[in-house]
Amino acid sequence: MRLTVVGNPDNRRVGLFTAAVLAAGLPRPAVLPWADVLTGAAPPPAGALVRVDSPGEDPQVDRLLRRSVASARHGELIGLADTYAGLVDGLARVAAGGAELLNDPADVAALCDKRRCHARLSAAGVPVPAALPSIGGYGELRAAMAEAGWARVFVKPAHGSSAAGVIALAVGPRGVRAVTPIEIAPDGLFNSLRVRCYDDETTVAALVDRLAPEGLHVERWLPKAGLGDRVVDLRVVVVAGQPTHAVVRAATGPLTNLHLGNARGDLAELRAAAGPAAWAAAMQTCVRAAACFPRSLHVGVDLMFLLGWRRHAVAEVNAFGDLLPGVLADGRDTYAEQVHALTSGRWQRWRAATKVLSGAVTGREPVACGT
């Protein structure tokens, strides 16, 4: 077995996967840089087995994806829709040579569009927060919230990642409150590592209106379960249909992403709070979420238990959600687990099984958590 990785050569993701491949006794994978893909390099040929890694964290690649002559400034929220279009085009280029991709381009395209991902999960009966129809700006958002009877929502850029541009918005008799990592500067919007609160409605309205042209996905803000004084959710990595690795994310506010200064929680404590039956049901939901993207070796599922621990919902599914440094299961990290799935035949068996079952998940009634 000879693997190729499409990625940014100096990125730790490529390094961690390469280490896992070598530890399994396989040849060092070839690396095809994203920058080369986007500037016309020949794609991997038929017969190659290709892992496509995140194109993020590289200014040159970001500029190429956006088809821009100018680099984005650090943290700048710019060209999210253009970046998505560039990613979809880049994936098509990678696939053009007939190689077998471990991240199917159609799956990745759906996963990187929160609207399409939510619709696919809902249609398959996976519990997700209820969502509003397309929103063109703040006025439409407030009108849709009023019609739905919702006081709290998450406003998400359709093509954002890592909480970039996300706004947790609450409205009430005393006004509005928006919790977000967005820093508003005179010359643009910037994603920050510090969460901010905005309570001036004019400011909040302008923020939503500036993000809206990139495309927005708006979901009901569901009350999460908590441990101690923090709310919690989970990142669960599903490899070849099996939930193998999980990290608890604990926060004092609504945004739980670890890079925003939040802490890893205690998985054993969370499992004890949920109880065996609720935990098993949640893991089965992660399997069902992954089965919505059956041609992808792995996905990262963001799963939340709701207040009371008896119900749960999937907040997001991530195409490149396997970066969980230091988290081991059966002695393997997420990258070693993926290599094991390939060498053991589990990946091939799961793909065959999902092909058989794919007809069973079509045509089902959408499922959404409304409370």
Feature-to-residue mapping (PLM):
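Short, solvent-exposed loop/turn segments at secondary-structure junctions
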Residues: 10-11, 159-162, 223-224, 243, ...
